[in-house]
Amino acid sequence: MSKNSDDRRLELLQGTLDMLILRTLQWGPQHGHGIGQAIRAQSDDLLKVETGSLYPGLHRLEKRGWLKAEWGVSEANQRAKYYRLTAAGKAQLSRERDRWSQLVDAIGRVMNPAPTGKG
């Protein structure tokens, strides 16, 4: 990867990793490395989830009952833990999306305020 690509990378906002993991698993079961790669690919290489954040996040979501994990064999013929979204995880993703939309709207109002007529 070129230095230019690294310069384009964006830091994940606090609290967005769970939403991104849940959304990625909405497309189907995936192992941890695949989840990180999917987030990176879907963001056009702008988001990179570090292993030190991804796996604790997966374990946290599994503990909350939003993910279910099972051992399987990866495309590289390696043993891997596959995660899938549960019904509770789907409901949580819906809540996270609603909150995200509200946050984006609120930030947009601050960044692009309506004209007030004041100079």
Over which residues does each language-model region extend?
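Basic amphipathic alpha-helical segments that dock to polyanions
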Residues: 54-61
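A cross-family signal for key residues in well-ordered alpha-helices
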Residues: 23, 37, 59, 94, ...
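Short, structured helix-loop boundary elements
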Residues: 10, 51, 79-82, 97, ...
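Beta-hairpin "wing" of winged helix-turn-helix
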Residues: 62-78, 84
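Amphipathic alpha-helical dimerization/coiled-coil segments
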Residues: 88-119
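Short, Lys/Arg-enriched N-terminal segment that forms or immediately precedes the first helix
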Residues: 1-10
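N-terminal helix-turn-helix DNA-binding core of bacterial DNA-binding proteins
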Residues: 9-53
